[in-house]
A protein has these predicted regions:
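Non-catalytic interface/linker regions that flank or bridge core catalytic/transmembrane domains
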Residues: 1-229
């Protein structure tokens, strides 16, 4: 698509790029159409996302909406792209101060990227949860893969929600298992949530050291892309 893989574009589209306002609008539309609610707080009450995820979604949405409104005013037109010409001025309007060697425009874009990443995370979890609610598997019986993971229908699920905190190498192991089991669609919503919650606590070096075998040498590990969102 026109905005495909543009989350880290240097001039991203606040509305249409991955992790943008359109993603939030679409997932809320699906939620409302399926009868689960039309607000983040309502979705949290229905158990589709956690209260924390609801707060994060609201915060990221507010950041993107604020940037978009300021951008429209500054450009004098309906401009949704964070063009280079506007980045420094927007940063100044937001009261950002340069911290050499970082420019204010870099600080502005970091704020955008964090919001876009957060939107992608919440969106992914919510879409997976919606799919499971709308199309529930009939009497799905877990199939054990090892002590850390199991198959739950077409989803890879951690057997313990704290597995990634206890064993950092399990993050990369989950990517390898998705490569080894083509019948698995992706990590389950619960597993993604556990992985993302543990990620800030895990140093990349420690994660690599925790692996007892060179997992990254096996398969093309396309599933590792999910770790960055």
């Amino acid at each position: 698509g026109r905005y495909h893989d543009a989350t880290h574009n240097l001039e991203p589209n606040i509305k249409e790029s991955p992790g943008g306002l359109r993603d939030l609008q679409n997932v809320l539309w699906v939620s409302r159409a399926a009868g689960f609610g039309k607000s983040w707080s309502e979705l949290a009450r229905r158990g589709l996302i956690t209260p924390r995820e609801a707060r994060l979604a609201q915060r990221h949405q507010a950041i993107l909406q604020d940037l978009r409104i300021r951008l429209h005013y500054l450009a004098g037109r309906r401009e949704d792209r964070l063009l280079f010409d506007f980045q420094t001025t927007l940063a100044d309007e937001l009261g950002m101060s340069a911290k050499p060697p970082r420019r204010t425009s870099e600080m502005l874009m970091q704020r955008y990227y964090r919001a876009a990443k957060g939107v992608t995370q919440v969106n992914t979890i919510l879409l997976l949860t919606l799919e499971a609610r709308i199309f529930p598997g009939a009497n799905v019986v877990p199939v054990v893969i090892n002590e850390r993971f199991q198959k739950l229908g077409e989803w890879l699920e951690a057997t313990d929600e704290n597995v990634f905190r206890k064993e950092p190498g399990a993050i990369l192991e989950s990517a390898l298992l998705l490569e080894q089991h083509p019948d698995l669609k992706a990590r389950s919503a619960a597993t993604l949530r556990a992985m993302w919650q543990a990620a800030p606590l895990i140093d990349a070096v420690n994660c690599a050291i925790a692996l007892e075998r060179p997992l990254l040498l096996k398969g093309n590990n396309a599933s590792l892309v999910a770790l960055t969102y």
